[in-house]
Amino acid sequence: KSLSEAKSICKEIGYPVLIKAAGGGGGKGMKIVEEEGKLESLFLTAKSEAKKFFNNDELYIEKYFKNPRHIEVQIMSGKNKTVQLGERDCSVQRRHQKLIEETPSPVITDDERKNLLEKTVKMVEQINYEGAGTVEYIYENGNFYFLEMNTRVQVEHPVTEVQTGIDIVKEQLWIAFTGETALKQSDINPRGHTIECRINAENPSLNFQPSPGTISVCHQPSGFRTRVDGSVF
């Protein structure tokens, strides 16, 4: 909440650090601080942006990794059990916003995957979570670092749906009504490789500035195992 508190935290975890808006998302209000001399100005800027975008100027600080991968695990959890639906690799980003999501991750080993999925299930079970959720991690040099848990159905959930054949929204509603998940871990049989690409209204000639306007022509891709989620027809 204060600059003095921020300095203390940064000293404890070591630079570089990432300052993030506590009530935010979508890459807004995020600042990378390479050294202590830059902390004050970036802290105040992040605080101002957090207030502007989210009406909440609280910030949190975490260790910044220079060459990380963003790996997340999809789970469905009820009073009876927790089931994992595999991981997604969301490392291709611009301005901290996801552009490409894929599963399985091309960078982690089978042993790393097994360990990650098992530990994620145990963590979710310990907090007695109910519903669909995504547990997010930073991965670097063979190590996973817990980032956050998104307690909702995420934009990239179709990647997992195509890969597993599981309707995540349907299962979320089932858990909401019954308190339990009808899935079994043995039901989850991922197949192939699935990639999702987000289409954004941006102008690449102007450093990807927002470029809203009327869509006059829309030709959507099609073909075997091709899925389009959107509001343009």
Predicted ranges, named:
Residues 21, 26, 33-233:
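ATP-dependent carboxylate activation and anion-phosphoryl transfer catalytic cores
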Residues 1-29:
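A conserved helix-loop-beta module that forms one wall/lid of the active-site cleft
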